[in-house]
Amino acid sequence: MAGSAGGRLHRLHVPPAPPPPALPQSIAVDEFEWGMRGTHLQVAAGRLQIHVYNRGMDDHDLAVIDAQGVLHTVPLASGADAVLAVDVSAGPVKLFCSLFAGTPDSHEAKGMAFNVTAK
C-alpha cells in the first residue's frame, strides 16, 4: 500500500494555519485634484477612524455614509487634515469628496472617490 510501511500508515503532522491578521480600524486618506488614495482596501466593520489629508490646492471635503445610512462630512481647506470617526457595516464603504454633488463638475465625478471593504 502506498505510504505505508509494514501495513501502518504514517501521518504527517501539519500545524494549524495561524489566524489571519486583524483588519485595521483606522485608515489614512489623501485627497488631491482629482483623486483619492488610502492606506488600506479592507478594514474592520464597526468604528472606523479616518484621518484625511487635503494634499490639493483647492478646498475639498471628505464624505462617508455610515452603517445607518447617515452622511458624515468634514470640510478641508488646502493643506488641512482632519479625523472623522464613523460606524461602518460589513460591505463596501465609499469615501468621496461631496463638493458640487449632483452636477457634472462634482469632485466625485472627477475621480475623488475611494472604496474600502469592511469585514
Which residues does each predicted region cover?
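Secretory targeting and sorting signals
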Residues: 1-11
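Extracellular/periplasmic metallocenter environments
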Residues: 9-28, 35, 57, 76-119
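Structural beta-strand segments of beta-rich domains
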Residues: 34, 46-50
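Short beta-strand segments of immunoglobulin-like
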Residues: 35-42
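Short beta-strand/loop motifs in extracellular/secreted proteins, especially
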Residues: 48, 58-62
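Asparagine-centered strand-capping/turn motif at beta-strand->loop junctions
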Residues: 52-56
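Surface-exposed loop/edge segments in extracytoplasmic proteins
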Residues: 61, 68-75
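Short edge-strand/loop segments of extracellular domains
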Residues: 67-70, 117-119
